[in-house]
Amino acid sequence: MSLTVYNTRTRKKEPFVPVNPQSIKMYVCGPTVYNLVHIGNARPVVVFDVLFRVLKTLYPEVVYARNITDIDDKIMKAAKENGESISALTARFTEAYIEDMAALHNLPPSIAPKATAHIEPMIAMVAALVEKGHAYEADGHVLFDVQSMKNYGKLSNRALEDMLDGARVEVADYKRYAGDFVLWKPSADDEPGWASPWGRGRPGWHLECSAMIETHLGNTIDIHGGGRDLIFPHHENELAQSECAHGGEEYVRYWMHNGYVNIDGEKMSKSLGNFRTVRDLLQQYHGETIRFALLSAQYRSELDFSVSLLDQSKAGLDTLYGALKNAPATSTDAVDLSDNAGYLALLDDLNTPQVIAELHRLAKIVNKNEGQEAAIAAAQLQALGGLLGLLQQEPEAWFKATTSGSSELSAEDIEQLIVERKDAKLAKNYARADEIRKELTEKGIALEDSASGTSWKRI
């Protein structure tokens, strides 16, 4: 029983063989905190959270780092436009990011390093690259010389000339070659900056992740994840500067990248007006529903995110929680998933659609059986769901939960109406009792009367 992952570097699925089986090292690029994160930013967080959970079932220790980029030209621009300090802006959006990712049921990473706390190792890495002949100073900048690395482009599988077409490559007269990228840039007096051998300045975009990985995880890590849009130039340049700084030592053993998120069949963009922040979505949908939607496609595929998908995800979770609600009391502590089709699908490059299919199969077993067979299936259902970050609420709480921006009736209001309905029935005022049931139904509340009383759920 072993994990297989698709390696962007080799462009094929490979058995996962860690550098050190006693301690797995994984890094995922986090947000640049100048605004609220959108649903596309959330996909890699959810995907690699699932991988984090799976790895923890296989290895004694998994160290997962996901950074916060808190120094960047976009941050400086946003702070200036908002009339607030950079530290205030980044603190505000870092907090919002942490809250939003927690609302999507993501585990916190082992480490959440911030770029500004790693300026010294960044400067040290630049100095090493200059000393080894892989970087040069020009016009107050320090640039990486891409032609000094003979296999530059091995991650994105591009020739040097091809990389300049349509990529985020800054054109500047001071570069020896157009593809050279900035490691360190000068800062004006009114811009944030740090003292360095090349003058007061700040780090380039790519340098930050390399320095944080070196500091917390070492020169070689097992897995580096992120969105497909980061393959070039960001991850290509990360790889180049890290391997050249460390004498050619392998930087990352497995590169993993998730596909894009489209909105209603179109690329998500502010210009199209289909830009959806996680915070906006949480006003309308439970975080677990959004998470389920993000896992409905295999992570390397493009995901068409839509209201229809969210509604299907809500219905799917209703079905699964409904099975758990009616299941015999059980514990997931001693559940063995080693031969379960869903767990094996997770080990096969995180095939989450197959896992979801297995969850529904287990739910059917729970619904059609009683006693021990139903209890075993329910325990497997909850344990397997847990590896996806799903089905960890009490079923009763799921059916009664409201969204953060909801104008729905509160649980207290509903309970009060149920008491009023009960009193009306006792007083033989059946018209009022029926009126209350109708009122609740119209507001999406289903009542279920039984010998033990009246229960309710949102529909």
Swiss-Prot record:
Which keywords are on file for this protein? Aminoacyl-tRNA synthetase, ATP-binding, Cytoplasm, Ligase, Metal-binding, Nucleotide-binding, Protein biosynthesis, Zinc
**Binding locations of ATP:** 270
Q: Where is this motif: 'KMSKS' region?
A: 267-271
Listed GO biological process terms: cysteinyl-tRNA aminoacylation
What is the annotated localization of this protein?
Cytoplasm
Query: Which positions does the motif 'HIGH' region occupy?
Result: 31-41
Q: How is the cofactor bound?
A: Binds 1 zinc ion per subunit.
Primary subcellular site in the record, as a coarse category:
cytoplasm
Protein's name in the database: Cysteine--tRNA ligase
Gene coding for it: cysS
